Regions:
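VWA/integrin I-like adhesion module and closely mimicked acidic/polar interface patches used
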Residues: 66, 99-127, 357-396, 401-404, ...
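Extracytoplasmic/secreted cell-surface and envelope-processing proteins
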Residues: 23-28, 94-101, 258-263, 289-294, ...
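Acidic, polar low-complexity linker/tail segments
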Residues: 76-78, 189-249, 259-263, 271-278
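Von Willebrand factor
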Residues: 50-70, 85-100, 122-136, 244-349, 359-361, ...
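DG-centered beta-turn motif at the end of beta-strands
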Residues: 89-90, 253-255, 338, 346-361, ...
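Bacterial Sec-dependent N-terminal signal peptides
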Residues: 1-27
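C-terminal "exit" segments of structured domains
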Residues: 400-439
Length: 439
């Protein structure tokens, strides 16, 4: 009888121990977490060196643990715009009975307890990577396990001043090394290295962009090439491929972190100003210093206009736009800026929007007011394409342009049809683009 009780006790304890992991995560959160975890990308080993030069912070776990290695790191993400989060784990099991999916959920729940809003934010994009390179416990322990969070700091007056100083330095250096009248000359610029902080295991905690210019020189390649430091040289790449654009009206987002792209635009324009390719510029910063709760879609403000024929005046207006624009959240007033631009140039031929792929359209609801084709140069597309800009291009019979390709046929897509852009598949559902998850 006593033996029977012992057996029952052992069975009971085993049952409790096997179920305690899943009890950590509330049932109502399981659908959110499972959507993030579905269809992971398999890699032998996650390599931080392949990350982009955007700000990012790593939040590591020890192998097999659901406790953050150092939860204080999460404080660095306060007052930031988080756009992309990657969860990384390995598939090695010390015992066959181990349930990896439960540990994955627990780790997500650990992040949820600190930042629950991330899991309900439609602007945050998630991905999951499973590492297959750990064939032993020692090998698996040496792999990174945790989250990599890509973010941008919220703009401040100080950060915008730093971006203006960088932009001035970039333009001045470029124009010193490349004569405006030189035909078939390219500008190659190497920028300062990034800042990395690592823990004792060698994992990056943080990586930031340094705006200083290190070297600049010319070559005879016939294009404007901004070097290999930036993974995204969208503006120069698109302009080099589309030399037929003319009588342009260019709308350029000058909110925080857009200076690497606006630098390419300004240098290109200065080197081509005598060709009269561009007639007008419109810069926008999403409402100047207006606080987020006071911004109204369609009437946000922070829009600045300049003719294209005087480069000095153009720079002054651009810097004024940047100086006045440090009070914002992520969405931008692209539609409002374009409607203002149309008033200035009714006979412009090619309408260009240089847009921040990280930011949604604050005034998306007014897309139907744009009655001219818009050529959208998307900046920051390393992690995917913002669907709202696809909708804008299709609705206006315009086009999307990334560092890799030009997509001109969006207006021809019918309901239910699919298209692949930069390796991401999209389908038209209810008149809008929806990303297709590949299984």
């Amino acid at each position: 009888m006593k033996l029977t009780h012992k057996i029952l006790l052992i069975i009971g304890l085993t049952s409790i121990m096997s179920s305690c992991r899943q009890d950590i995560v509330p049932n109502e959160l399981l659908p959110k977490f499972d959507r993030i975890l579905q269809d992971p990308t398999a890699l032998t080993q996650y390599d931080f060196s392949e990350s982009t030069p955007f700000h990012h912070i790593a939040l590591p776990f020890d192998f097999g643990s659901n406790q953050f290695h150092d939860s204080l790191i999460i404080d660095k993400l306060e007052n930031t715009h988080i756009k992309y989060i990657t969860y990384i784990y390995s598939d090695y099991k010390k015992v066959d009975e181990f349930k990896q999916e439960e540990l994955n959920r627990e780790r997500l729940y650990g992040l949820y307890q600190y930042m629950p809003n991330l899991f309900d934010d439609d602007e945050v994009e998630w991905s999951t990577i499973v590492q297959t390179g750990g064939q032993t416990e020692k090998q698996a322990t040496n792999l990174f396990h945790g989250f990599v969070v890509h973010y941008r700091p919220s703009p401040t007056m100080e950060s915008m001043k730093a971006e203006i100083d960088y932009l001035k330095s970039m333009i001045d250096t470029a124009l010193t090394f490349v004569a405006p009248t030189t035909e078939g000359t390219s500008l190659i610029i190497t920028l300062g290295t990034d800042i990395a902080i690592s823990d004792s295991a060698g994992f990056y905690y943080e990586r930031e962009l340094d705006f200083s210019t290190v070297t600049a020189h010319t070559s005879a390649l016939g294009t404007y090439d901004f070097g290999n430091y930036f993974n995204d040289t969208s503006v120069s790449a698109v302009r080099n491929r589309n030399k037929h654009w003319e009588r342009m009206l260019i709308h350029c987002d000058l909110t925080g972190s857009m200076s690497p792209y606006s630098a390419q635009l300004f240098v290109w324009h200065r080197l081509n100003i005598d060709k009269n390719k561009v007639q007008h510029f419109v810069f926008f910063n999403d409402g100047d210093m207006t606080t987020d709760d006071q911004k109204k879609a369609g009437k946000t403000g922070g829009i600045y206009y300049s003719k294209a024929d005087n480069f000095d005046d153009l720079q002054k207006i651009a810097y004024k736009c940047m100086s006045n624009g440090s009070g914002g959240d992520a969405p931008e007033n692209d539609i409002e800026a374009m409607l203002e631009g149309f008033k200035k140039c009714k006979d412009c031929k090619d309408i260009i929007l240089i847009a921040d792929n990280w930011a949604n359209l604050r005034d998306y609801e007014f897309i139907n007011k744009i009655d001219r084709p818009v050529r959208i140069i998307l900046c920051g597309t390393q992690f995917g394409i913002n669907k709202q800009y696809l909708d804008l291009a299709r609705a206006t019979k315009g086009s999307i342009h990334t560092i890799e390709e030009d997509i001109e046929n969006l207006m021809d897509l019918k309901e239910g049809q699919e298209i692949t852009i930069n390796g991401h598949a999209f389908v038209i559902e209810n008149g809008r683009f929806t990303e297709v998850k590949k299984i």
